[in-house]
Amino acid sequence: MQWREMGVVMGTRPYGDEHLLLSILTRNRGLRRGLTRFTKKRPLQIGDLIDATWRAKLPTNLGHFTCEVIASAFYSYFRDRIKLMCLSSITHIMSTALPENEPHPTLYDSFQDFAAAAEAEAPWYNHYLKLELLVLSQLGFALDLSKCAVSNSKDNLLFISPKTGRALSEAVGCAYRDKLLPLPKVLRSISCGVETECCSADEFALSLRILGFFLRRHLLQESHTFQESRKILTGLLG
């Protein structure tokens, strides 16, 4: 049994003295795991784009990867702590939450858009927020930010219900604002597929707090790593 495909490194961890357990995201096969030999010469890092060949006797076996790095992520992220933490966050989210062997080509393409913007030193906040929104929607927990859940109005949408993930207008939600989440304009625009200019650091931080709430609630309840890293990340942004 063998296949070959481009993939992005989602994570590695030691497996014995000479191997790593490697997690990669591919466009056509989704999240895949397998063993690969550890090398000090050019160690694999999260975000690396690799040409991966997987081999096993049976499809259900863990299997082994032979990898060639096509593009290293290190130089695009290591000088920017916020960018590096976002890369670490999204790879952790996807390697933890995505089911194995289930293709998510839209999610893969969105990751590549984020990586391209980050590596080109272009505005990338919106690309990252789109990624987290897609993780929720692809796994069945989409936020509905297109209209008010009560009145169906598309105007003055200022809140999100923490219970339903649906938008609420100012008129409907004002009396309950202490129990609701704020709705940043950038999240609504991205969710509705509307092109918008890159958000500010403050709006990015607010959006991360909101998406973090829903990711933690639906997909990462037991991930203390995610909770701690999200606190640090939003703290750095202000």
UniProtKB/Swiss-Prot annotation:
Q: Which GO terms describe its cellular component?
A: bacterial nucleoid
Alphabetical GO biological process terms: DNA recombination; double-strand break repair
- Record keyword Magnesium present: no
Top-level lineage group:
Bacteria
Cited SUPFAM superfamilies: ArfGap/RecO-like zinc finger
Q: Which keywords does this chain's UniProt record carry?
A: DNA damage, DNA recombination, DNA repair
What family name appears in the similarity comment? Belongs to the RecO family.
Instruction: Sum up the protein's function in the record's words.
Output: Involved in DNA repair and RecF pathway recombination.
Q: What is this protein called?
A: DNA repair protein RecO
